UniProtKB/Swiss-Prot annotation:
The PH 1 domain mediates the oligomerization in a calcium dependent manner. The PDZ domain binds to the last three or four amino acids of ion channels and receptor proteins. The association with dystrophin or related proteins probably leaves the PDZ domain available to recruit proteins to the membrane. It comes from Homo sapiens (Human). It is a peripheral membrane protein. Residues 484-540 form the SU domain. Phosphorylated. Partially dephosphorylated upon insulin stimulation. The gene is SNTB2. This is Beta-2-syntrophin.
Length: 540
């Protein structure tokens, strides 16, 4: 792995670390349409390019015995056999539809022999490509149907059809060349006798990175094909590579998130819009770790650019004094509780501004999207309650997690998050702690009405001056109690509506009815105290 120059943008803020960008290239496997296919992966500073490898076929399991046994059988064989090697779970498009059932409708019935009449066009011939032949111990199979040509217009042929005869000439024992010549000499009107073979369809329909790998914003580079009946000849191959370029900006690289990885060989790359997931498999654990670190490093190196774009977008359209600078934004995983008590990690995008902690399910590239987070929590009422290792492994060690608690009118809201690296954990820990303290200094004070000893009063907590309890008298107010923070001996709440404060004064413990859940003000008080202690150098 080669490392490029440092790339962190100047002025990105103290929360942003200096990152270097990695370059890397090598062979990996890609889960594409429920199959593992070999691709050449090339990592640059801003993108990951995947190129279909010509040797990918070597990774594919050999066709099952059903296809070979077809030769010589009057009606074809093995329709009910299955192919080995298919993964139990895939993220690509579904497999081709099942062939028509037999007359009785049984799922295992052998597909019928069909007779199809095709009229050749002046240019393009039948418009099919074929594979197989006696020398390959395979039937003659339709491997490609070219859009708009004769076979396609007939609407009666499909990929995976075995050609049994052409104008009455039996092709069950034909070699590939014999089949090609029979199709070429067939004249303008061609009567084909065909039968669908389900087992070979996944292998005939070779996955294409361009068409089968959905990814918003990816740049495709697609091969073009000739319209000949003989797809096996080198003269019909086009040198253009089947290639997909994945922009890394605001992608989420993860391990052991959406797919089990018992061998620690998988890497997951989630798109910024959360709609697509790319799964890569490496040859061993060490290689997977190396690739993951490189991809993750480059994604993180792009964050200063993302922050600059976000702040420019928000600042350009906000009203005077209403802008909230985005301090940090990145993907991580949040623990979600499912029915039956089960738990699951799911991707979540967390952003920290001057005053708020925001959670999104996709990257908010527009101001409207930014204004609609899934959750929004004031930093001054939020605290970090855990940061460290868990019990399971996202890559080579235990889970790295941190938890937040926020005081709200509904009580305490808790979130457990998982990060992928120790550097991420340290970064988020620092950002949240410093962000909460900075929010306390920025907000300065909170004030709310409440009941004390049966009368309406106002409780004000000021970051510098401490506590003030006052009573409104017409247009003026009178101060009942004023205490600095160091006079607070005890604070508590009942979790419902009452806040208890004891300053050691002659009035004793004050019971304040807040008319709603006291947790928000309790958490603000904790943040003020924590920020002041840290500022005094008593807590690092």
């Amino acid at each position: 792995m080669r490392v490029a120059a440092a790339t962190a943008a100047a002025g990105a803020g103290p929360a942003m670390a200096v990152w270097t960008r990695a370059t890397k290239a090598g062979l990996v496997e890609l889960l594409l349409r429920e199959r593992w296919v070999r691709v050449v992966a090339e990592l640059s500073g801003e993108s990951l390019s995947l190129t279909g490898d010509a040797a990918a076929a070597e990774l594919e399991p050999a066709l099952g015995p059903a296809a070979a046994a077809f030769n010589g059988l009057p009606n074809g064989g093995g329709a009910g056999d299955s192919l080995p090697g298919s993964p139990s779970r895939g993220l690509g498009p579904p497999s081709p539809p099942a062939p028509p059932r037999g007359p009785a409708g049984e799922a295992g019935a052998s597909p019928p022999v069909r007779r199809v009449r095709v009229v050749k066009q002046e240019a393009g011939g039948l418009g099919i490509s074929i594979k197989g032949g006696r020398e390959n111990r395979m039937p003659i199979l339709i491997s490609k149907i070219f859009p708009g040509l004769a076979a396609d217009q007939s609407r009666a042929l499909r990929l995976g059809d075995a050609i049994l005869s052409v104008n009455g000439t039996d092709l069950r024992q034909a070699t590939h060349d014999q089949a090609v010549q029979a199709l070429k000499r067939a004249g303008k009107e061609v009567l084909l006798e065909v039968k669908f073979i389900r087992e070979v369809t996944p292998y005939i329909k070779k996955p294409s990175l361009v068409s089968d790998l959905p990814w918003e914003g990816a740049a495709p580079q697609s091969p073009s094909f000739s319209g000949s009946e003989d797809s096996g000849s080198p003269k019909h191959q086009n040198s253009t590579k089947d290639r997909k370029i994945i922009p890394l900006k605001m992608c989420f690289a993860a391990r052991n998130l959406s797919m089990p990885d018992l061998e620690n060989r998988l890497i997951e790359l989630h798109s910024p819009d959360s709609r697509n997931t790319l799964i890569l498999r490496c040859k061993d654990t060490a290689t997977a770790h190396s690739w993951f670190v490189a991809i993750h490093t480059n994604i993180m190196a792009l964050l200063p650019q993302v922050l600059a774009e976000l702040n420019a977008m928000l600042g350009a359209t906000s009203t005077a004094g209403g802008s909230k600078e985005v301090k940090h934004i990145a993907w991580l995983a949040e623990q979600a509780k499912l029915d039956g008590g089960r738990q699951q990690w799911r991707p979540v995008l967390m952003a920290v501004t001057e005053k708020d902690l925001l959670l999104y399910d996709c990257m908010p590239w527009t101001r409207d999207a930014w204004a609609s987070p899934c959750h929004s929590y004031p930093l001054v009422a939020t605290r970090l309650v855990h940061s460290g290792s868990g019990c399971r492994s996202p890559s080579l060690g235990s889970d790295l997690t941190f938890a937040t608690r926020t005081g709200s009118r509904q009580g305490i809201e808790m979130h457990l998050f998982r990060v992928e690296t120790h550097r991420d954990l340290s970064s988020w820990t620092r950002i949240l702690v410093q962000g909460c303290h900075a929010a306390a200094e920025l907000i300065k004070e909170v004030s709310l009405g409440c009941m004390l000893n049966g009368q309406e009063v106002r409780l004000t907590i000021h970051y510098e001056n401490g506590f003030t309890i006052s009573r409104e008298n017409g247009g003026s107010s009178s101060i009942l109690y004023r205490y600095p923070f160091e006079r607070l001996k005890m604070s508590a709440d009942d979790g419902i509506r009452n806040l208890y404060l004891d300053f050691g004064g002659p009035e004793g413990e004050l019971t304040m009815d807040l008319h709603s859940c006291p947790k928000p003000i309790v958490f603000v008080l904790h943040t003020f105290l924590s920020a002041k202690v840290t500022r005094m150098g008593l807590l690092v």
